[in-house]
Amino acid sequence: RVGGTWRENTYPGCGCDVPSSLYSFSFALSSKWSHLFARQPEILSYLEEVSEDFGIKELIEFGTELEHAEWDERRHLWVLDTKTGEEKGQSLARTVVFATGPITEAQIPSLPGLDSFKGEMFHSAQWNHDYDLTGKRVAVIGTGASAIQFVPQIQPKVKELHVFQRTAPWVLPKPDMDLGDTSKQLIEKLPIIQKSWRKAVATSLNVINFGLRNPAALQPVSTAAK
């Protein structure tokens, strides 16, 4: 199934930190986004629709592992050794793009006592939706992008919440909003609105990228955040 990280991650509050208009293909803009910042189910649905609409899904070999890749100088081709289940295969390609999606696999830390812990334990990328956190004492290890999203979602229902972090990140309120049916209908009828908004968002993010390369330029933002 297509989706990558948006297929694997289903924790409470899972979504994108980039506005939906930009976090989509320029050749496949959508008027279906319910919020300015899309949620995980919507992004997964969008990726599935795009893969089907453009005939990509039928070309994907799911469950296939790339075991070896070697460049054949004589033929100017890549020789790819693959494995699907117990069946091995070989393919030739002019171009190879490594898009292995490393963040689709949960990275479990090596912590003392982890193996002997008797309570419920799971990674945010392998969220146990059958386990009710209501009234529980919960410890969250790490404050990456996932924790920033799910901690506010579970905090109101748990009895105690302890968050352990190595480095505290700066977190600003997300300027999200419900787009509503009227906005979606308007975008569908006048695609130029979304295209213009997409360009505006891209420009603003490019300004932020400049600030990341030149930290002094972000000092006003840092001051406002404090």
Q: Model-flagged regions — what are they?
A:
Residues R1, S91, F98-K226:
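Rossmann-like dinucleotide-binding core of oxidoreductases
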Residues R1-I60, Q165-A168:
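Beta1-alpha1 glycine-rich phosphate/pyrophosphate-binding loop at the start
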Residues W6, W33, W71, W78-V79, ...:
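Tryptophan-centered motif/residue detector
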Residues L29, E67, E73, E87, ...:
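Residue-level detector of flexible, active-site-proximal loop/helix-junction positions
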Residues H35-T104:
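Feature captures the FAD/FMN-dependent oxidoreductase FAD-binding
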